[in-house]
């Protein structure tokens, strides 16, 4: 696919020394002509099966509408190709689990494009959480809004919320247990343009997200509140992307007055940790190639993608039930993980390097 996001994948894979882009498929011939003019020598087709039949192609990137992900990924894996599929992995958890099992059976990499796992600020924040510098995490609050682009195939939660759900799981190193969600269909009859969701984790941590296509401001923020410190990430701010606040509440057994309570609020320095500046999409592409060629698994695998899709399903169910807290059933992770063991071997089909994408 070379619509809104596909050309960016073309660019980053072309920039890598260890990969070369051979084909691009899209149903729109004018889009193909445009990318071909930008990348001379690129072969194009309106039938993706043509590139799947090419033995020189070792891996494919799927950046098509979400509803098509499962079918195309299935055919690619069956053709012996490694696969990087844009988020979300697919529309249903049944499809996601089937893809995970298939990837394991054929011994091919199936990576999901949860690109914010390669964001320098999120990576640094994860390091701080794992090191215990924020203390016990009480809650997370994410906002992801903009004015458009409005999609007609999935709602704002599937489109935008997928990012935040993957970030929550990455930072907490945990699988959510329940979700409550509500949304509003404003510009289209049955597709939510704005969604609010609260996700519960096993240790009691709460994670809240607000996503919208109908907002005057582009906002990409995440606040993490811990027992020791608090963090605020703002992906739109190029200077102060990540701030660590030495603020909190020193809790004695009790307090006698409001004045005494105010004294318990602790406010100290604000720290701006050094962040490695890199393009997340380029790093994701580099990681995918490394996984294929070297057997170095990083990023979001099929199981990670499946958990996010299962959470999305539960959130939609909650919306249909007035926002009721809905269990997130992830009752077969061991089966999927076991079957997907070959994913980390980095096996390759016989062909010449560099990798053909």
Task: Report the location of each language-model feature.
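N-terminal Rossmann-like dinucleotide-binding module
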Residues: 1-39, 355
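Rossmann-like dinucleotide-binding domain that binds NAD(P)(H)
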Residues: 147-217, 223, 237, 303
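Beta-strand-loop-alpha-helix segment that lines the small-molecule cofactor/substrate pocket
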Residues: 59-117
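C-terminal glycine/acidic-rich active-site capping loop/insertion
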Residues: 115, 228-300, 324-328, 335-357
